[in-house]
Amino acid sequence: LLLRLLAASEGRVFYQGEEITDASGARLNQLRRELQIIFQDPFASLNPRMTVEQIVGEPLWLHQNMKKADRQYRVAELLKTVGLPAAWAGRYPHEFSGGQRQRIGIARALASGPKLLLGDEPVSALDVSVQAQVVNLLESLKHQLGLTMVIVAHGLAVIRHMSDRVAVMYLGQIVELATVDEIFDAPLHPYTQALIASAPQMQPGVERDAPLLQGDLPNPASPPSGCRFHTRCPYVTDECRQVEPINQVLDGGRQVACHRWQEINRDRSVIQIAPPSAAFLRRRALFEHAATHSSLPSRNS
């Protein structure tokens, strides 16, 4: 919708304070030069009948009417920028690996000199061994070229590595918006807390109980009334079932859409994402028993 590849059925799209929902003609062409996308599947997003030079050079011809010699030079520069030899410009997509194809897709997205780059799950279709390389490339390009990037992803590691601000969505609605550190270290919304707590821990022997979500994911085409998360939320009330929460803006521009976020987070540190583990509760019980009795209970008590 942001790139106008699909028309919005409702709502409005704003870019730099300007509504672009119905942009057309010359303005739409300008927007498509400024807004580019890295598609999710590098095996489907490149035309198998076109060479790399044609794929990367097409935006240069469409948006800048660049002559062939100049296009060839610019394509060589772009390939070097994404870590590919310029000599590969005459090859076809089937001659490359998935990671190399995604680099070609990134070079094509950069060709028009965009101001904003949208990454639609840019590494999810790649092998894990290649994902880190592409993520590091995008991070480097962001700083090198001064790009604004919008990354759509479900991988928490990718989000934490690449993001400055994070919007957490559930059934098509933003439930929390905050800096990356706030989201990962001190989530406020129950869904965000469950999401972060679900990440595997890399500390052997350390127990961490995630708040389990009950029920199945509702049909996005027919979302529940009130708060869309209420069918799975452990803190649900009648208000949650009936009244849709608004985004409450907190200090620093942080936003959370939850009726009970203050109550939920009042009596505990929001940095502690999961409830205390069973092992922790057992140790605390032993400590409290020792404080009031002369001897500790046995292991079988």
Enumerate the predicted regions with their spans.
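P-loop NTP-binding/switch modules centered on Walker-like glycine-rich loops
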Residues: 4, 115-208
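Conserved ABC ATPase signature
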Residues: 92-96, 100
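ABC ATPase NBD coupling module
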Residues: 20-36, 54, 62, 68, ...
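Short catalytic/signature loops enriched in Gly
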Residues: 177-287
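Conserved ABC ATPase "signature" region
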Residues: 19, 69-87, 196-197
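Conserved signature/switch motifs of ABC ATPase nucleotide-binding domains
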Residues: 33, 94, 112, 136
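Conserved ABC transporter NBD signature motif
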Residues: 11-19
